[in-house]
Curated annotation (Swiss-Prot):
It comes from Rickettsia massiliae (strain Mtu5). The gene is atpD. It catalyses: ATP + H2O + 4 H(+)(in) = ADP + phosphate + 5 H(+)(out). The lineage of its organism: Bacteria, Pseudomonadati, Pseudomonadota, Alphaproteobacteria, Rickettsiales. It is found in: Cell inner membrane. Produces ATP from ADP in the presence of a proton gradient across the membrane. The catalytic sites are hosted primarily by the beta subunits. This is ATP synthase subunit beta. F-type ATPases have 2 components, CF(1) - the catalytic core - and CF(0) - the membrane proton channel. CF(1) has five subunits: alpha(3), beta(3), gamma(1), delta(1), epsilon(1). CF(0) has three main subunits: a(1), b(2) and c(9-12). The alpha and beta chains form an alternating ring which encloses part of the gamma chain. CF(1) is attached to CF(0) by a central stalk formed by the gamma and epsilon chains, while a peripheral stalk is formed by the delta and b chains.
Length: 473
């Protein structure tokens, strides 16, 4: 079959116009076109047909040095990337090229980054909890298999460490794989994450097939086309893991979903579309829906996504975060105030929530214990002003008891992480859900009122707290 060849007629930043004159056939919308800029392959994605013989494209790489008249070849399909276990332990860019300097990714499976969401008949409607082994999450804001979790956190509160522990625990407990999509990521942060994963054993350089994670990066310095599509590239790899070997549980991280929206806004402006509210693209809801609807469980496996979400100017009504919220099943909020107390993971037990914290799904005991824990913590929070002004002595005996229990609960919500062993020297703990519920049930019922506060800090199960109390005496 003869190749469909065109020539570049106009270049405006990341937008490139290509004219096809040979047989009058235009490439389809979303097709990938290839050209070479001084031996460097550049992929262009068809965005618009602007006449009988010209297409307008978005470049997936820098157009610096590209000139008019350069030959462009229609590949005949959308962007295709390598998928499967060969991607484990590797970093690739939006078009599937390795960027870790470790040679080509030799995968026999190549897949388009555009796929329809699974059919309704193939989707699973069961709601099962994904046990993470992290007490505060499993008890108060449980994740669901195939669910979407929003992770809100500023700089330095432990977001990366929490992400790495989730990667480690889910892979260990479920034998599942993880995909990390760095969307508009700072190159330094992406580099740090990669090296931390190597140090903590999540990536095995000697035997890459034993790694638990595949990484796809579209850094902050890259053109908007790459940043707008890199989440789809990551999701395509996650889907391949979900559907292989009779199904897998896959964890899919996106950092940051706001930058995916922001890149879409830039692309929209470059294509001359009329902006909608606050300057965002008119297709904001559609773009978000196309990504989010593919993140789902089938009868064979699940994709559970954890999405870091930046909230511009702390305005939750901004169209970008507001559109994301509509798709989330749970929110995990990391708090600087809790991090300042030295309690890690610094998850806010009162701000974080989950749709699956429902007696019909988690069971009556789990639901009851979680609500009692939150009630004790909420009472303690409302008493803090009184304590700050008048001191503990002015409280009633009942309130004093509540404060003592709340402080123990606060400390028991902390736990040592496997991936932080290098820094803390403390052995990481994976806590089963039954042990988590039993421990907090005993705390709210007053069974451990005689144990010192320090015994509950940075331990796994309640038995470890009892053992620690013996050593403190």
């Amino acid at each position: 079959m003869a190749k469909n060849i065109g020539k570049i007629t106009q270049i405006i930043s990341a937008v490139v116009d290509v004219k096809f004159t040979n047989n009058g056939e235009l490439p389809e919308i979303l097709n990938a076109l290839e050209c070479y800029n001084d031996k460097q392959r550049i992929v262009l994605e068809v965005a618009q047909h602007i006449g009988d013989d010209t297409v307008r494209c978005i470049a997936m790489d820098s157009t610096e040095g590209l000139v008019r008249g350069v030959e462009v070849i229609d590949t005949g399909s959308p962007i295709r990337i390598p998928v499967g276990t060969e991607t484990l332990g590797r970093i690739m860019n939006v078009v599937g090229e390795p960027i870790d300097g470790k040679g080509d990714i030799k995968s026999s499976n190549i897949s388009s980054i555009y796929k329809p969401a699974p059919d309704f008949t193939n989707q699973s409607t069961e709601r099962n909890i994904l046990v993470t082994g992290i007490k505060v999450i499993d008890l108060l804001a449980p994740y669901t298999k195939g669910g979407k979790i929003g992770l809100f956190g500023g700089a330095g509160v432990g977001k990366t460490v929490l992400i790495m522990e989730l990667i480690n625990n889910v892979a260990k407990a479920h034998g599942g794989y993880t995909v990390f999509a760095g969307v508009g990521e700072r190159t330094r942060e992406g580099n740090d994450l990669y090296h931390e994963m190597i140090d903590s054993g999540v990536i095995n350089l000697a035997e890459p097939e034993k790694s638990k994670v595949a990484l796809v990066y579209g850094q902050m310095n890259e053109p908007p086309g790459a940043r707008a599509r890199v989440a789809l590239s990551g999701l395509t790899i996650a889907e391949s893991f979900r559907d292989m070997n009779e199904g897998q549980d896959v964890l899919f991280f996106v950092d940051n979903i706001f930058r995916f929206t922001q890149a879409g806004s830039e692309v929209s402006a470059l294509l001359g579309r009329i902006p909608s509210a606050v300057g965002y693209q008119p297709t904001l809801a559609t773009d978000m829906g196309e990504l989010q609807e593919r993140i789902t469980s089938t009868k064979y496996g699940s994709i559970t996504s954890v999405q870091a979400i930046y909230v511009p100017a702390d305005d939750l009504t901004d169209p970008a975060p507001a559109t994301s919220f509509a798709h989330l099943d749970a929110t995990t909020v990391l708090s600087r105030q809790i991090a300042e107390l030295g309690i890690y993971p610094a998850v806010d037990p009162l701000d974080s929530n989950s749709q699956v914290l429902d007696p019909m799904i988690v069971g009556e005991e789990h639901y009851s214990v979680a609500r009692q824990v939150q009630q004790v913590l909420q009472t303690y929070k409302s008493l803090q002003d009184i304590i700050a002004i008048l001191g503990m002595d002015e409280l009633s005996e009942e309130d004093k008891l509540t404060v003592v229990r709340a402080r123990k609960i606060q400390r028991f919500l902390s736990q040592p992480f496997h991936v932080a062993e290098v820094f803390t020297g403390a052995e990481g703990k994976f806590v089963n859900l039954a042990d988590t519920i039993a421990g907090f049930k005993g705390l709210v019922e007053g069974k451990y009122d005689d144990l010192p506060e320090a015994a509950f800090y940075m331990v796994g199960t309640i038995d470890e707290a009892i053992e620690k109390a013996q050593t403190l005496k």
